[in-house]
Amino acid sequence: SHSEKGVIELMPTSDGDVYGFKYVNGHPSNTADGLQTVTAFGLLANVANGYPVLLSEMTILTALRTAATSAVVARLLAPKGANVMAMIGNGAQSEFQTLAMKAIVGIDEVRLFDIDPAATTKCAANLAGQGIKVVACDTAEEAIMGAQIVTTCTADKQYATILTDNMVGAGIHINAIGGDCPGKTELAPAILHRAGIFV
């Protein structure tokens, strides 16, 4: 379900013996009310009798899974020896992304940008002492300078273009994780036309 305020998604699966789903939302304006922007929970049920066997909070699991997926993909597809990542969009997921990239890919520098400077300040503070150089940037263009990996994780649903074609050189690995529903585009179409795309 998509609305002007956010998105609610159900992610079901079954192997014939058990049925499970994850419920997750994304509502960027929740912070104005002191609420998390993302919450998730999951249910696992016995297919034979329909009874639930597990109900679990999955907000942290969602953050970990998303970051781990990005890092595993970057390990396989990013240029060998990549050690600098640009992180465009500095909400809570950005910290998980950075730590996963450090652990799995071996990055030693992250360049941060968010349209909300307070988000960048918070992300940088939370990453302090993690053994990674953190550079706060004033623009997306500045953030991607020298980065071999670019991760976008933005919440804009107004067809915003976060990265334009002239910003991204050849050989850059992009994890566009914020473009997950209608209206959340992040990348200029020209980038997609000249890129190898993996979903």
Residue ranges and their predicted role:
Residues 1-63, 69-71, 78-81:
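N-terminal ligand-binding/catalytic initiation module
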Residues 77-84, 106, 169-170:
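Short helix-loop-beta connector
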Residues 94-95:
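N-terminal Rossmann-fold NAD(P) dinucleotide-binding loop
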Residues 167-172, 176-199:
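Rossmann-fold NAD(P)-binding glycine/threonine-rich loop
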